[in-house]
Amino acid sequence: MALHRHPFVHGAASWDGEQPSPVQLPHISACPFTSSGRKEDPFYFTLDPTGQARQPLDISAFSRIMTDMGSLNSADDHRPETSFYSGHKLLSLNTDTDPESPSLSSHSDSQHLHSLSLSAPCSETDNKHDMQYLAMESTKYPSQWSESRTNRSIITTLSISQRSKDDIEPNNLQTDFTRGDKTPREKTQDVTLENAANGWLSAKAGRKKRCPYSKHQILELEKEFLFNMYLTRERRLEISRSINLTDRQVKIWFQNRRMKLKKMTREHRTRDPGTSFTV
C-alpha cells in the first residue's frame, strides 16, 4: 500500500483532497514507542519540530473527544461549549492527579466560566454537568467560595443602604423646603398653638397668680366682716385705702368670706340637727 505525500505544517496536518468527516475516523490504537522515545511504525509521525520525544498521549480519551465533535457537527444546533467542557473535564482530571499545578487549574477554571457566560442557553444535561462541576470546585476550594459569598453579601448590603439613603435625602430636602417657605406670621401662629397645647395640659393654664394677703390686711378685713358682711361702696373704698388694696380685691374677699360662712353653717346643721346657728 503506497502512502501519498501531504504538505506538513508545524503543529497540524492537512490534506489536499476532500477532508473526511470526523465521524468516519477509526479508533486509533496506542502508538508503539522505543526506549529512545522515537516511533518505529512508519505510519505515525511526530508533530514536534525539535525532534524531542513527547509523552505518550491518552489515545482513548482523544478518540472519545473526536467522536463527540463529529456527533455535534452532524446535529442541527452546534454548541462548542460541550466539546470544550469535555476537554476541560479531561484537563481537570489531569490536574487532580498533579497537585503541584494550581495555576493551570485556576486558568482553566476562568476559561470555563468565561465560555459558559458567552455561550448560548444549554440543555438540561449541560446544566446538570455545570452544577456538578461547581459543586466539585466548591468542595475543592471552600475558602475561595466562602470569600466570594461574603463579598457578594457585602455588595448587596451596601447597595441596599445606598438606596435607603437616596430615599431619605429627598424627604429631608422637602421638609426643609417647606419650613423655609413659612412667613413670620405663620411661625408666630405655630408658636402660639404649641404654647396653647402645653398650657392646656398644665393644671393652672388660664388662671392669674394668687396674691396672698398679709396678716395685717386679713385682720382688718375680718374685723370689718364681723360688723358688716355687706359693705357700701364708700366703706369699701375707705378700707381699700387703709390696707393698701384695690376696691375689686376687697369686694372679692368679702364675697369669698360670705360663701365660706354659708358652707360652715351647712356643715354644722348636718352634723348637729337639734342646734340652731344664727348668722
UniProtKB/Swiss-Prot annotation:
Region (Disordered): 91-112, 167-187
GO cellular component, one term: nucleus
Keywords assigned by UniProt, alphabetized: Developmental protein, DNA-binding, Homeobox, Nucleus, Transcription, Transcription regulation
Keyword Nucleus: yes
Compositionally biased spans, kind Basic and acidic residues: 178-187
CDD domains: homeodomain (cd00086)
Subcellular location: Nucleus
DNA-binding region per UniProt: 206-265
InterPro entries (UniProt xref): HD (IPR001356), HD_metazoa (IPR020479), Homeobox_CS (IPR017970), Homeodomain-like_sf (IPR009057), HXA10/ABDB-like (IPR046333)
Molecular functions (GO terms): DNA-binding transcription factor activity, RNA polymerase II-specific; RNA polymerase II cis-regulatory region sequence-specific DNA binding
SMART domains, sorted: HOX
Biased amino acid composition, Low complexity: 101-112
Entry keyword annotation includes Iron: no
GO biological process: regulation of transcription by RNA polymerase II
Functional note: Sequence-specific transcription factor which is part of a developmental regulatory system that provides cells with specific positional identities on the anterior-posterior axis.
Family designation: Belongs to the Abd-B homeobox family.
Protein name: Homeobox protein Hox-B10a
Native organism: Danio rerio (Zebrafish)
